[in-house]
Amino acid sequence: MGFSRIRCNIDGMSENQAPTEKAAETVAEFNRVPSILSIQSHVSYGHVGNSAAVFTLQRAGFEVWPVHTVDFSNHTGYGQWRGPMIPATDVREVIKGIDELGKLDDVDAIISGYQGGSDIADVIIEAVALAKQRNPKAIYSCDPVMGNAKSGCHVSDDIPPLLRDKVVPVADVITPNQFELGYLTGREVSDLESTIAAAHAAREMGPEAVLVTSVLRPERKEGEIEMLAVNGSGAWLVATPYLPLKRNGSGDVAAALFAGNLLRGRGIDGDLSVALGNTAASIFELLKVTHESGSGELELVRAQEAYVHPEQRFEVTKVG
């Protein structure tokens, strides 16, 4: 047979056709950089909210469209700050403007964190519904920022019930710490068994996957801290060395990287071990670099290689 007689049929190509528009679209989709709409706080000094998530995700290879819910001089952990909470109407206008450009069609994920005013919840819910209308494959990852076991809640009293009753039910993924998971589910969360059970209880509220960003349980090995990921396919645990520091924004970075790793991995309903392992390795290296520098803020820029090629990997174990 001469070469002129060879025929093939590739993804919709007729036998004697040049590549079709559909085939070209497939190639373009393969090469497209994923886009993430990030609705969070912003600070001028330091790295929390969008000031943590945007650079991290961009360095990891994602397009990020930040929408700010507050515009503060610094995070509130300093005890003093200046700047406004962004009115919900203004946040809505920014998202509306993106949609009017036709760009919500290209959103692969929406992430949200610290909300500022209580009326931001409705804007986020509307944005998620609109983005999924434009692109049904888009996922929404919610970091239900409320507080932690040591300092308690650091948001206004009306935020936690709004997160629990309105925002979490529309999320595909949530990324609470143990304290936040306990509040959302109304359960005591202490050991591994109760943490997994609470994660599944949270899944019954709507999300498919849960990342517990910091697990401190009495039965863990001394000198370690853990992360837990749970979905309908199982539960996975990873331990990293415990570093004696707490820096605001580390949870924001973890939530952002986990969402990015899910987009590049096996989805939210499959094996979460790769996304969990990659996230834990990057966060540990970021905290290690920060600890060694003695900086009071995350060394987000200095540690940037960790978001792509972390030096150290940690074993991920299936525990459920």
Locate the predicted segments by residue.
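Glycine-rich phosphate/adenosyl-contacting loop at the front of the ribokinase-like
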Residues: F3-I86, F314-G320
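Charged C-terminal helix
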Residues: Q17, A23, G270-G320
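Membrane helix-loop-helix hairpins that form the core translocation module of multi-pass transporters
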Residues: D108-L130, I139-N148
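A short helix->loop->beta-strand "cap" motif at the edges of active sites that frequently abuts
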Residues: A131-I139, G206-E208
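Conserved phosphate/ATP/ADP-binding segment of small-molecule kinases
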Residues: V155-A235, L245, R264-S273
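Short glycine/serine- and small hydrophobic-enriched flexible loop segments
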Residues: A256-R264, A281, E285
